[in-house]
Amino acid sequence: MSKIRVLSVDDSALMRQIMTEIINSHSDMEMVATAPDPLVARDLIKKFNPDVLTLDVEMPRMDGLDFLEKLMRLRPMPVVMVSSLTGKGSEVTLRALELGAIDFVTKPQLGIREGMLAYSEMIAEKVRTAAKASLAAHKPLSAPTTLKAGPLLSSEKLIAIGASTGGTEAIRHVLQPLPLSSPALLITQHMPPGFTRSFADRLNKLCQIGVKEAEDGERVLPGHAYIAPGDRHMELARSGANYQIKIHDGPAVNRHRPSVDVLFHSVAKQAGRNAVGVILTGMGNDGAAGMLAMRQAGAWTLAQNEASCVVFGMPREAINMGGVCEVVDLSQVSQQMLAKISAGQAIRI
């Protein structure tokens, strides 16, 4: 089997050296070239035809975003962004994902060599995922038109969504058309700390419903979406007659914190047939067991189809486990989940 050919673009010689060490330490990939800036990278891409590009977000001569935008228009290829953990870094990274980057890794703020080498397995996994990702499914999505929701007969109704690789854009596409009369949404997207707040703020500006990073103990309200904070689990809990959010630092589940399974299991327990579960694009199996629990509790469950997924991992696992009632294209997810909530449809198996 041929190795995954990687090209790294970073203005830091140290980062280029570290990325080369990491990539070449894995037998299924190789660093074919490195470039100090996008202008040099342009020629190296033509020469080496890499399978995956790792790209620093902030660089001299040509901004990483400008280069990414041109690259995706002229020669689309899988890109993993390398980002700082700053507020500006998270905003730029979210814009990069919007432009077509598959995923991102964050630079540690202190001890870059030790920190990056500690992330070696994670970086390799993201490169492998990017190499297999569907670029066709990652074309920039046009803003969907606003949907009409049926009357929300009960504040007990809610929607739980889980996603990973490719999920930031998929979630945007699902939330943007939702009207203010939508039920509450609880969302777990695999993301590091700091990025989830920027992600929520970005969505809040684009959507009619309110979108925010979830806080421990807050009441769950219709017309609002709550994003699990990075590196913390989010669960649905009850306080008397009302739903509320529980945020905690439990151990990683399926190697993830926040974990989709943690959210889905709590929704199965607290909301049962009043919930709709949605699993979107992502690598791995997080959410599959939780979605089965939701379906067994009477919830209607949806999975994004393979054709519209950047990575058809999590939906496939949920389908194979028997937890999915319906498989739909990303363009139909918003409409279908509102229809099921309004109709009060649920299924028991």
Swiss-Prot record:
One of its GO terms (molecular function) is protein-glutamate methylesterase activity. The modification 4-aspartylphosphate is found at D56. Phosphorylated by CheA. Phosphorylation of the N-terminal regulatory domain activates the methylesterase activity. It catalyses: [protein]-L-glutamate 5-O-methyl ester + H2O = L-glutamyl-[protein] + methanol + H(+); L-glutaminyl-[protein] + H2O = L-glutamyl-[protein] + NH4(+). The active site is at S164, H190, D286. Keywords: Chemotaxis, Cytoplasm, Hydrolase, Phosphoprotein. It is found in: Cytoplasm. Residues 5-122 form the Response regulatory domain. It is an enzyme of class 3 (hydrolase). Its main location: cytoplasm. One of its GO terms (biological process) is chemotaxis. Its EC number is 3.1.1.61, 3.5.1.44. Involved in chemotaxis. Part of a chemotaxis signal transduction system that modulates chemotaxis in response to various stimuli. Catalyzes the demethylation of specific methylglutamate residues introduced into the chemoreceptors (methyl-accepting chemotaxis proteins or MCP) by CheR. Also mediates the irreversible deamidation of specific glutamine residues to glutamic acid. Contains a C-terminal catalytic domain, and an N-terminal region which modulates catalytic activity. Belongs to the CheB family. This is Protein-glutamate methylesterase/protein-glutamine glutaminase.
